């Protein structure tokens, strides 16, 4: 029963998240002009970091507060155990947010539509054909973010364990430290990146979304290499903070890039394909790649700091090259978008 419930919850969350973000990106692109799109998507994207931080803080509070309580009886549901009540408490605010969104957010007027199939779903083959026409742009974004994601998710998975093995901290304290850094500096970096994108767009640099991605990946690379190699936590913490900040600068840039070069009726599907192409390798091989280097290159569990440095350095360098390769293609995609865009 427990396994079935957890699996059902995980499936439902996955479907919800996979549906929400592509649709949200497309709606935001209809609500805001190009010169404000970076900040708008950045504000939305900070939810990743703020949510992760709140999950740690509020989730920990809920577990500590409720775990020792006695089961309670609720109408219809019957006896509720403490662990079940914990899920209910942390999940209930979601219903409040759903109600607020349902009654305050309306469907925006669609802009930048290429097809005449108003109100009908566009065939998936048409989306693939469009992406093939812009293959240099989408290819560089997909490959660049898959490679960068391997480095990033490798760090997310192993940083607490690295701090424990290398610097002797308790795993709980290490996780809380990195979680706090990730939440605060990640949100700050995302907002900064969105503001810089809009400022440069207003100055006439329309290719800034993809160009800045390459720059931000390049900026984050040395911090990914050096953070695990610091001899003390006194030095590792500021390096970790800079890594979180520079890595998050690009968080809203690819959504901006995809929304600007893709017609309205294709945007959500294009974004979904981006998530599939980038997150599958990142989540599938991020943590695994660090473990493989640790086991088969160094054959030493306490060499994890070297593994993090190598995986981070190699993957981020390749990701930067891939994104830089797409800059010219992105400029060409922007030029083609003038055929169907409502505004210049």
What does each model-identified segment do?
Residues 134-193, 247-251, 255, 282-290:
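Extracytoplasmic gate region of multi-pass secondary transporters
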Residues 107-142, 166-169, 343:
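Juxtamembrane intracellular "pre-TM" segments in multi-pass secondary transporters
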Residues 8-49:
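Cytoplasmic helix-loop-helix junction between adjacent transmembrane helices
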Residues 198-216:
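Cytoplasmic membrane-interface "Motif A"-like loop-to-helix N-cap segments
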Residues 1-9, 226-239:
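Helix-loop junctions at membrane interfaces in 12-TM secondary transporters
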Residues 97-104, 221-230, 309-343:
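Multi-pass alpha-helical transporter architecture, strongest
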Residues 44, 48-103:
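Helix-loop-helix hairpin linking two adjacent transmembrane segments in secondary transporters
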Residues 39-67, 182-190, 275-287:
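Glycine-rich segments within core transmembrane alpha-helices of 12-TM secondary carriers
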């Amino acid at each position: 029963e427990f396994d079935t419930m957890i699996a059902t919850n995980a499936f439902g969350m996955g479907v919800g998240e996979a549906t929400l973000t592509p649709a949200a990106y497309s709606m935001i692109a209809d609500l805001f002009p190009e010169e404000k799109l970076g900040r708008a998507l950045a504000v939305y994207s900070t939810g990743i970091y703020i949510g992760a931080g709140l999950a740690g803080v509020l989730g920990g509070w809920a577990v500590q507060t409720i775990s020792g309580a006695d089961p309670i009886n609720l109408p219809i549901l019957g006896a509720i155990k403490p662990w079940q009540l914990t899920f209910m408490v942390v999940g209930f605010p979601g219903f409040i947010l759903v109600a607020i969104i349902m009654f305050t957010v309306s469907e925006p007027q669609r802009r930048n539509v290429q097809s005449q199939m108003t109100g009908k779903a566009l065939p998936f083959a048409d989306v693939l054909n469009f992406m093939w026409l812009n293959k240099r742009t989408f290819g560089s974004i997909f490959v660049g973010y898959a490679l960068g994601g391997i480095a990033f998710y490798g760090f997310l998975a192993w940083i607490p364990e690295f701090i424990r093995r290398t610097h002797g901290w308790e795993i709980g304290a290490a996780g809380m430290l990195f979680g706090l850094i990730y939440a605060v500096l990640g949100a700050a970096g995302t907002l900064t990146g969105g503001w810089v994108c809009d400022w440069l767009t207003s100055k006439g640099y329309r290719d800034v979304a993809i160009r800045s991605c390459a720059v931000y990946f390049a900026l984050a690379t040395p911090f990914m290499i050096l953070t695990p190699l610091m001899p003390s936590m006194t030095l590792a913490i500021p390096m970790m903070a800079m890594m979180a900040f520079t890595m998050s600068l690009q968080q809203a840039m690819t959504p901006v890039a995809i929304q600007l070069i893709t017609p309205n009726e294709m945007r959500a599907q294009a974004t979904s394909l981006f998530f599939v192409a980038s997150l599958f390798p990142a989540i599938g091989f991020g943590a695994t790649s660090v473990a493989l280097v640790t086991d088969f290159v160094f054959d030493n569990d306490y060499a994890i700091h070297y593994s993090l440095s190598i995986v981070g350095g190699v993957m981020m360098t390749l990701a930067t090259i891939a994104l830089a390769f797409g800059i010219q293609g992105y400029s060409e995609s922007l030029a083609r978008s003038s055929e169907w865009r409502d505004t210049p």
